Amino acid sequence: KIHMLQYLSDIDMPKGVVVISHGFTESAVKYDEVAYYFLKEGYHVYIPEHCGHGRSYRLTADPSLVHIDTWRRYIRDFLKACRYIKKAHPDLSLNLYAHSMGGAIGGIAAAWEPDWFHKVILSSPMIRPLTDNVPWPAATGIALEKCIFGKDEEYVAGRKPYDGSGSFETSSATSKPRYERYKNLRAEHKELQTWSPSYGWLWASAEMSWYLRLYGWKKYTAPMLLIQAQTEDLVSVRALKNFAGKINRQGKTSCDYIHMIGTKHEIYGSRGKILEKYWGYIFTFLDDTENDIDHR
């Protein structure tokens, strides 16, 4: 089963609905603050947890391991959640906010069902993951070989089970209180202790990347906002720029591209003034009616 958090706005006329697609090793509760800002602006918010994360179902008994058998499972599950949301709010537009791995999942979902989404916000999306010091072709080749020989549930080399380690200095956030809040939650709740990828996940991430870069970009009709962090160690910036460029050159819709100075990969985990600017960009984009298409 897919676990999903629901936050309903208490205003009389909500602006719409936002579905959040979280990132690798994350969970719905990490996005409490993100949900709060959308609620304040008059949106209902839903946060489904992807397979292998939080309280959703898993394909492995190891609570530290993020494993998937096929990338399509992520997309099917996410669209199933979106279908439920659309049925619950048939008169409201559905908007997508997606981060990192969730950007790949949400991005493909919006390519499979372009008419479902009113506007799409991709924050540090995983158009192509970075693979540390291993070249991308070598990393994907190793992952494929492991999957072929039945070792898809093995930890990727150099990765390990959750042990409570990790520091703010090496994290993807720039706000220490925001970082420490989730670190403490993770230490207290076993279901939040997803930590490392399997070779099956690595191969699935490669297949999602190829789909987005070869096919997905052609299918969008909803206006898109893509926000890139200044310091980025987890996703390819070149892939982000190429992805946005192809969407804009095709001309079916627009992809606004913003480079956020003073941020790391988790832009939503930034400090004061930078975070205010980030949310300013997002709500200006959502409030802009110039390119609106009715996708209810």
Q: Would you name each region that the model predicts?
A:
Residues 222, 236-246:
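Short alpha-helix in the alpha/beta-hydrolase fold that links the catalytic acid
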Residues 254-256, 260-296:
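Catalytic active-site module of serine/aspartate enzymes centered on a nucleophile-bearing elbow/loop
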Residues 89-100:
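Alpha/beta-hydrolase fold nucleophile elbow
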Residues 101, 105-193:
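Alpha/beta-hydrolase-fold enzymes
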Residues 28, 35-61:
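Conserved alpha/beta-hydrolase
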Residues 23-26:
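Active-site glycine-rich loops that stabilize anionic/oxyanionic intermediates
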Residues 66-86:
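Alpha/beta-hydrolase active-site loop
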Residues 220, 226-228, 232:
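Short beta-strand/loop motif that positions the catalytic acidic residue
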